[in-house]
Amino acid sequence: MFDEDARVASRELDLALTTRDRSVADPEQRTPMCGVPYHSSQTYIARLIAKGYKVAICEQIEDPATAKGLVKRDVIRIITPGTVTDAAMLEEGKSNYLGAVYCEAGKCAAAFCDISTGEFCVAAFEGDNLSHVLNELGRFAPRELIMNKGAAETQTIPDFAQKKLGCLLEMGGDDYEYTACAAIVCEQFKLNSVRSEEHTSELQSLIR
């Protein structure tokens, strides 16, 4: 790890910082670096995930014997607190939820999924809905929460999630168009449609 990644890892994992730039007179201008043994990397990754960090795994993507110059490396996997599936990084007997909240025009919907088990729950609210959303967040206690702009702008939801639950916050993309979202749901669950004559507004919030 290098630069700011190295500084963060050094602080959070009690690792010694070093540098290759010994020839640079000013220590502040040297590139900090640190690392861990490959065989024990999972232990260190688990500690970072437990502290709420995202971890990107990079590996060589070409044979060093045939590479010209520096061996190419690329990100092959990103692990986040809400997307962990490795049993060694999960607390035994405790759910590990990834949450999502969508708020728009007086309506809110929340979804929670434990990717390691496949458990999935959704709920939609109208009217005085913030208290209901906070109750659901407190009940499921997600490790990571994805929000749309409407949910983030309430301030109440991100503050509660971050300060009370200590979960990692992520902003969802701008594309919450209903038709596109419904198509994804139909493809995932092998449905012809998600139309309903009842609870139409709640359903649309949930789909988004």
Q: What residue ranges belong to the model's regions?
A:
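Basic, polar low-complexity surface loops/patches
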Residues: 1-197, 201, 205
